[in-house]
Amino acid sequence: MLQQQTQSPGWRVLNRDVIKYIAMTAMLLNHIANIFLVPGTLWYEVLVDIGYFTAITMCYFLVEGFRYTHSRKQYALRLFGFGVVSQVPFSMAFAQNGILEFQDFNMMFTLFLCFCILLCIETIRNRFLRGVLIVLLIFGSLFCDWALLAPVFTLLFRWFGQDQKRLRFSFALSAALFGWLNYTSSVWLYPTAQCLLMACGSMAGIAASGFVILYLYNGQRAARGKKFSHWFFYLFYPVHLLVLGVIRVMG
């Protein structure tokens, strides 16, 4: 996806699947913290911040996958289908009371909306209609995990993702925006110095994603186990949520 990926091959040692496995691990740590740990504590903040690596990484690979997939229809159906499959485990894992509690739609639905935004940009020629549909899709993300932010990440990667310098700007802007949102949402709950520290910490996962993709990603898929990795990434999401949800309920 990056025009300059071949200029420094010695540094680019991570393929797409390895980065996705890292993202899945980071997401698991984030979810463990959100479900089982007390907000504001050291380990909560550390694990949650590590997990912020995942969403922006998935948005980047969504844009890349959109460009190179053999079937955009099948891609969209997979995202929507696994969104449906994941909703009960998601509602179970993050319920505040009882076994199930609906709070918002899961990240698979968010990625589906982001995919639809990309489809609108690519296929709808009428600028007014295209703009209206994109705004509606962004509005729809308000009811999903990573509301507004995931569409913003996706649009930035769509516009700037094929140029190294602009991609650096996209990650920097995303990190700054996320840090600012975290600061403004916590400023009434914690002392100012702690809010600033937490905001800086929240930017670390996005910054790490930017470093990995900009400087370590070689633009390739794993040479072996492509089919296994492909389905593992989809299945891991609902399965790990179900396991965490069962542990929460039993605990």
Language-model features, listed with the residues they occupy:
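Alpha-helical transmembrane segments and their immediate juxtamembrane cytosolic regions
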Residues: 1-251
